[in-house]
Swiss-Prot record:
Family stated for the protein in its record: Belongs to the universal ribosomal protein uS8 family.
Gene3D superfamilies in the cross-refs: 3.30.1370.30, 3.30.1490.10
Family matches, as InterPro entries: Ribosomal_uS8 (IPR000630), Ribosomal_uS8_CS (IPR047863), Ribosomal_uS8_sf (IPR035987)
GO CC annotations on file: cytosol; cytosolic ribosome; cytosolic small ribosomal subunit
Annotated protein name in UniProt: Small ribosomal subunit protein uS8x
Entry's Gene Ontology molecular function annotations: structural constituent of ribosome
Pfam families xrefs: Ribosomal_S8
GO biological process: translation
């Protein structure tokens, strides 16, 4: 597999394993951004538990899948998004208004678009899942 970005490779392997009906998937290499992205997905119930395995190299993450993930992806390049522009990005990326989440990296950390709107912070778009 050609390494485009670590986050893109991790989300793509999760999506492919979900389509094949697998119960768990191993993501490697790991990064802090992937772990924060997975925490947001887990908070909304799209994945089960995940575990970081330190192999004294770049590390691995084993993710439990629960069959709820339909699509996930990375937005590249990471566009700047203000608080007022979040609504336009959700309309463009997600299938409906109340379905799915956009993940942003902000000055307050990595969070979904609803939490960013509540905290009134903008940032850069990392990706989406639904």
């Amino acid at each position: 597999m050609v390494r485009i970005s670590v986050l893109n490779d991790g989300l793509k392997s999760m999506y492919n394993a979900e389509k094949r009906g697998k119960r768990q998937v191993m993501i490697r290499p790991s990064s802090k951004v992937i772990i924060k992205f997975l925490i947001v997905m887990q908070k909304h119930g799209y994945i089960g538990e995940f575990e970081y395995v330190d192999d004294h190299r770049s590390g691995k993450i084993v993710v439990e899948l629960n069959g709820r993930l339909n699509k996930c992806g990375v937005i590249s390049p990471r566009f700047d998004v203000g608080v007022k522009e979040i609504e336009g990005w959700t309309a463009r990326l997600l299938p409906s208004r109340q379905f799915g989440f956009i993940v942003l990296t902000t000055s307050a950390g990595i969070m979904d678009h609803e939490e960013a709107r509540r905290k009134n912070v903008g940032g850069k778009v990392l990706g989406f899942f639904y």
